[in-house]
């Protein structure tokens, strides 16, 4: 399935168009809004990457449709607007990478429309998506050390799945499939097939411990909900993770 999604993303890149002149063609925006449905009483440190809400936006200028990571855009103005938040400003954490967290006032509200607006050299663009609820997911509650986990969605239709595994006892993130640049965000968001299961490798569960497994179902913005950028290469997706406690006992 991952190979299929990768091939589909490559096709989209190749079909993005031969011309890349003008703001609308050259600016690529990739956005990912994540939430987590925390059970009462469960709190996790920031290094778990399981935030109640977080939004990441990558901006780049396309000089070659086969490499959307070629020229990240620094110094852009990026803002977030939603009914439950008002207007919030992103901070640039790395060149071309803009972040907003729950500690900044961001809230993930299923059913609300999230809007990201960006301004590059005086030109404006916008992306919007409706935030989905956390999926119903089957995850085993106990495992043998090193055992793979097949997370299955039992309710909801999603274009892709994101997941993260956090070792609570040792306060360590042991695995995730979250994107870390504009290209990998595009590949994650670009799927247009229904994905209902995800294989989490046994390397995420190598020692006896209690783990939190978060699984979220992506809903991706329609191209008509993106303006001011290259609509063939720009995407915005949202997912709320359901959280599951998994125990690996000592052998």
Give the location of each predicted region:
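Sec-dependent signal peptide recognition
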Residues: 1-3
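Short helix-loop boundary/capping segments
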Residues: 133-196
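Ser/Thr/Pro- and often Gln-rich low-complexity regulatory segments
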Residues: 11-121, 126-132, 162-166, 187-191, ...
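C-terminal motif of bacterial Sec signal peptides marking the signal peptidase cleavage site
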Residues: 6-9
């Amino acid at each position: 399935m991952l190979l299929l999604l990768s091939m589909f993303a490559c096709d989209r890149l190749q079909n993005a168009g031969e011309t890349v002149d003008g703001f609308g063609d050259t600016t690529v925006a990739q956005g990912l809004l994540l939430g987590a449905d925390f059970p009462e009483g469960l709190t996790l440190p920031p290094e778990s990457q399981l935030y109640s809400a977080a939004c990441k936006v990558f901006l780049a200028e396309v000089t070659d449709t086969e490499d959307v990571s070629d020229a990240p855009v620094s110094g852009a103005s990026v803002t977030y607007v939603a009914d439950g938040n008002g207007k919030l400003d992103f901070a640039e954490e790395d060149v071309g990478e803009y972040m907003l967290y729950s500690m900044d006032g961001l809230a993930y509200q299923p059913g609300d429309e999230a809007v990201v607006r960006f301004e590059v050299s005086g030109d404006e663009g916008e992306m919007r998506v409706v935030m989905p609820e956390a999926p119903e997911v089957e995850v085993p509650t106990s495992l043998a050390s090193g055992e793979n986990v097949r997370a299955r969605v039992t309710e909801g239709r999603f274009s892709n799945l994101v997941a993260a595994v956090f070792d609570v006892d040792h306060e360590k993130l042991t695995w995730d499939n979250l994107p870390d640049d504009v290209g990998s965000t595009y590949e994650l968001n670009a799927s247009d097939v229904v994905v209902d299961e995800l294989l989490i490798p046994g390397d995420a569960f190598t020692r006896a411990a209690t783990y939190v497994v978060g699984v979220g179902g992506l809903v991706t913005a329609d191209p008509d909900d993106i303006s001011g950028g290259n609509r063939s290469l720009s995407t915005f997706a949202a997912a709320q993770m359901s959280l599951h406690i998994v125990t690996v006992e000592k052998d």
